[in-house]
């Protein structure tokens, strides 16, 4: 677990990161249009590229929170997040892939988390790591991670192509059936 804090305020409010279920770790201002940081960001945790972040915020599919890896630039997160440095025998991208399946994440966290009266998570940052997982060798983790990264890239390319085809269809329909007037 990382205890590295932004004590010297190397990072400012423009560097605050959030964790999104769909988009991973994102810059708060770029993603949400503004920073939700408090008056001081000195107690915020520093997140380097490759660090693993656990958010206790419940999501519809993940009532015990989610785990994501910072694939972007370094920044800071609220004290509500737990930040972990990957061990030498762990590929952080594999950790995210492993926990992306909702059922696996929920089954891992369920025995570790107690929900409070206000539906808040009662699990310490250290206890969030007490569940057992069985990972392959680091070389195998890297190969699996690269395979899924290639699939994600392919999906992105197909999504772009689909959007371009929709635009082409729209253009063709407008030209086939011009507005009268």
Regions found by a protein language model. Give the residues of each.
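Feature detects amphipathic, helix-rich regulatory segments
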Residues: 1-181
């Amino acid at each position: 677990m990382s205890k590295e804090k932004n004590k010297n305020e190397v990072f400012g409010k423009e560097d605050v990161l959030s964790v999104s279920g769909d988009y991973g770790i994102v810059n708060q201002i770029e993603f949400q249009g503004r920073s939700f940081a408090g008056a001081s960001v000195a107690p915020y945790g520093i997140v380097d590229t490759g660090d693993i972040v656990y958010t206790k915020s419940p999501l519809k599919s993940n009532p015990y929170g989610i785990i994501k890896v910072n694939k972007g630039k370094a920044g800071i997160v609220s004290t509500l997040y737990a930040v972990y440095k990957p061990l030498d025998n762990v590929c952080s991208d594999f950790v995210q892939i492993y926990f992306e399946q909702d059922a696996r994440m929920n089954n891992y966290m369920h025995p570790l988390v107690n929900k409070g009266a206000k539906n808040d998570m009662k699990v310490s940052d250290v206890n969030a790591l007490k569940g057992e997982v069985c990972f392959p060798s680091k070389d195998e983790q890297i190969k699996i991670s690269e395979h899924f990264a290639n699939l994600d890239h392919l999906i992105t390319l197909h999504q772009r192509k689909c959007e371009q085809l929709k635009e082409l269809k729209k253009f063709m329909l407008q030209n086939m059936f011009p507005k009268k007037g």
